[in-house]
Structures are given as C-alpha cells and as structure tokens.
Amino acid sequence: MKNVYQIGSGDLTFDIIERIINENLKLELAPEAKDRIQKCRNYLDRKIKESDVPLYGITTGFGSLCNRNISSDELSTLQENLVKSHACSVGAEMPHVIVKLMFLLKAHALSLGHSGVQVITVQRIIDFFNNDVMPIVYDRGSLGASGDLAPLANLFLPLIGVGDVYYKGKRCEAISVLDEFGWEPVKLKSKEGLALLNGTQFMSCLLYTSPSPR
C-alpha cells in the first residue's frame, strides 16, 4: 500500500523520513523485521536459561547494584522499574512532531533485531505512532553520550500503562487510551527496559529538525 511504510525493510534515509512525516504515512513492521526481532529474543531467552554467570542489567541490578542477582520472577519488574525510575525529564513539553519522530527512529532501530525486545513491544510503538498517541516528553534531562535515558523513559512509560499522553487533542491517562484501543500494557521482559532507554533518538530528532542545512 502506498500510504504505508514497512519499518525494517531497508535503510531509513532523510528522504524516507520526510516522506513518512509529510505524507502522514502509517507504519507496519516488515515480515523480515519480525523474524529478526523474534530470532534475537529467542537467543536472549536461551542465553539467560543456559548461562551460569550473571548478565549485567538482565539478571543483575544496575550500577552499584551490579553484584545483586535478580531472580527469574523479578526480571520483568526490574525492567519496568528502570523505565519508571528514569522518567524524570523536566522543562517544556516537546512538540508532537519530535515525539512522533522519536517513535519512528526507535521503531527502526529495534527492527534491526539486535536489541532482544519482543515483537509486541515494537508493534505497540508502531500503534502509538499510527494513532497519534503522543506521550509527554520534556526538553531537559538527557545524559548525552550515555543516551537519552530520561526522555526515552518518558516516551515509553505509557507503553506499560503509566503516565499521561495526548490523544485527540486532549491530555489523558495512558491507561485510558490503552483501554479505548483494547491494548494491554506491554509486559516488559528481560533487557527490554535497557533496549528502550538506551539510544539517541531524542538528540537525533533535535538535530533533524534544527534549522541548519543537512
């Protein structure tokens, strides 16, 4: 379909980004991208099951808690808490065009199949993009080289049913919008919080929309 762009079907160039935004194209996950994502997820699940050593940020805590082992029944909670604890950006609300671009760039990055996420996680990002469900992201809080942790945490908090979003011009609770669409909050699996928060999609979008010529 001409009004749909398949994420993960090839390189995401400036020209393609402009076409997606200017022509208001919808996104869908390319079949080959689904295969890559699932293959990587299967590998990670197998690695966790078979490994006899701790895996940082996956079966251990973060930072100074790196020596704390996380039990298998707490792996999901660890990732959800990571997103919640880092959703602390402040300042002015970012324009919706920036928020939507962040979704686009992250969906593309995850479609490459190197991050260990679930297919449903990427699909929900695409769902938010296609239906103009815009999380509230603020303009202060990025760590720069370490990644846009706080802005990305604010971006993805609504995927797990927490925080507020703009939908149909109104600010409302994310969980109410999920209910309206019949979407279950994404149950993050091991490593997914890390995959969502590590990235430079916020900075990249600011650069892309800057007045400087490309």
Task: Name each model feature, range by range.
Residues K2-T13, P185-T200, S210:
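Signature of multi-pass transmembrane helix bundles
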Residues H114-R140:
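FAD-binding glycine-rich core of flavoenzymes that anchor FAD
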Residues N22, K26, N42, K49, ...:
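Generic secondary-structure signature for well-ordered alpha-helical cores
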Residues V119, Y166-I175:
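An acidic intrinsically disordered interaction segment
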Residues K2-E50:
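N- or domain-start disorder-to-order transition segments that initiate the globular core
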Residues G10-F14, A30-I37, R41, S71, ...:
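Generic structural signal for well-ordered, non-membrane alpha-helical segments
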Residues Y208-R214:
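Conserved small/polar residues in nucleotide/adenosyl-binding loops
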Residues Y56-I70, E74-L78, S85-L110, Y138-I160, ...:
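FAD-binding core of FAD-dependent oxidoreductases
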